[in-house]
């Protein structure tokens, strides 16, 4: 499926400007979405793209000039390099040093994190914290699953959610922990948001339908895995064997990413006692049903 074409710089609403990270790829889609949020002379920047992408720094400078604003603070949705990687370059090339707050949720279990070469410490937030700037109020939503430190942000003025990588504008997300991820999707569904500003891909206008689609998709994948194992109950399968059955319509270059997700489904099903794992000598899986 061809991806939507996104401009590098676009005003999405009265208080949200998207600056594309200029880092397209199989996992980043059109690139990381970074967002300037607010209406005043100082605004919040959500996410920062990857390190050493001068095109992004140029686009961000253009946005700051065009909207006659500067960066009040930075909030990053999670620790992945395509979201935190640009912080040091922004500090060096735009802000003349990190004399402002860079905030995120702590890793779980906690580990000390330093921001690139600038050795700036993060300001750690918690679920429910409120961050304000002129024209915008953001509420922190702890949404682990994609990563252990993942946050979404509710934009109160628009009944919208900045979803980070919990929900994408196109395709589906990868995750570290499926159990946590499903809980986070349910949490976002309960928000009854109208709109999603995702970490990658275009804006989602039917927020609740998209979140429900993600939940249904994961449940359907789980059923496909169980069906493949039950139809061959005398056999055991490697995770890649199952990818080739369950993700048969997915391009082969995405099979490794698909295997990552499928393995988490297998771990969840094992916890529930529905399947078992054996070593022979590689890890193989069989149905218990």
UniProtKB/Swiss-Prot annotation:
Highest taxon, organism lineage: Eukaryota
Cofactor mode of binding and number, as noted: Binds 2 Zn(2+) ions per subunit.
Binding site for Zn(2+) 2: 82-83, 119, 165, 200
CDD domains in UniProt: LACTB2-like_MBL-fold (cd07722)
GO molecular function: RNA endonuclease activity; single-stranded RNA binding; zinc ion binding
Alphabetically ordered keywords of this record: Endonuclease, Hydrolase, Metal-binding, Mitochondrion, Nuclease, RNA-binding, Zinc
Binding site residues for Zn(2+) 1: 78, 80, 119, 146, 165
Gene Ontology CC terms: mitochondrial matrix
Cofactor list: Zn(2+)
Keyword Zinc in annotation: yes
EC number annotated for this UniProt entry: 3.1.27.-
Predominant localisation class: mitochondrion
Cellular localisation: Mitochondrion matrix
UniProt key word ATP-binding: no
Pfam families: BLACT_WH, Lactamase_B
Role, per record: Endoribonuclease; cleaves preferentially 3' to purine-pyrimidine dinucleotide motifs in single-stranded RNA. The cleavage product contains a free 3' -OH group. Has no activity with double-stranded RNA or DNA. Required for normal mitochondrial function and cell viability.
Record-stated family: Belongs to the metallo-beta-lactamase superfamily. Glyoxalase II family.
PANTHER family in UniProt: ENDORIBONUCLEASE LACTB2 (PTHR23131:SF0)
Protein name: Endoribonuclease LACTB2
Species, as recorded: Xenopus tropicalis
């Amino acid at each position: 499926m061809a991806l939507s074409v996104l401009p590098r710089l676009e005003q999405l609403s009265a208080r949200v400007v998207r600056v594309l990270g200029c880092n397209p790829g199989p996992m980043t889609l059109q690139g990381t979405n970074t967002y300037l949020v607010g209406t005043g002379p100082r605004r919040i920047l959500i996410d920062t793209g990857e390190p050493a992408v001068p095109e992004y720094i140029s686009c961000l400078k253009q946005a700051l000039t065009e909207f006659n604003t500067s960066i009040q603070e930075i909030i990053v949705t999670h620790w992945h390099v395509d979201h935190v990687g640009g912080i040091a370059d922004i500090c060096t090339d735009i802000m003349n040093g990190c004399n402002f707050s860079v905030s995120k949720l702590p890793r779980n279990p906690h580990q000390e994190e330093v921001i690139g070469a600038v050795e700036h410490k993060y300001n750690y937030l918690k679920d429910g914290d409120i961050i304000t700037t002129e024209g915008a109020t953001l509420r922190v939503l702890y949404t682990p699953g994609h990563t252990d430190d993942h946050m979404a942000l509710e934009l109160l003025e628009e009944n919208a959610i900045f979803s980070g990588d919990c929900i994408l504008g196109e395709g589906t997300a990868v995750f570290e922990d499926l159990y946590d991820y499903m809980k986070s999707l349910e949490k976002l569904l309960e928000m009854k948001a109208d709109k999603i500003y995702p970490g990658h891909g275009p804006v989602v206008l039917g927020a609740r339908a998209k979140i429900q689609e993600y939940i249904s998709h994961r449940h359907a994948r789980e059923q496909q895995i169980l069906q493949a194992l039950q139809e061959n109950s005398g056999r055991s399968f490697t995770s890649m064997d199952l990818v080739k059955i369950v993700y048969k319509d997915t391009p082969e270059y995405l099979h490794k990413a698909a295997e990552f997700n499928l393995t988490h489904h297998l771990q969840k099903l094992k916890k529930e006692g529905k399947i078992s794992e054996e070593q022979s000598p590689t890890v193989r899986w069989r149905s218990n049903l």
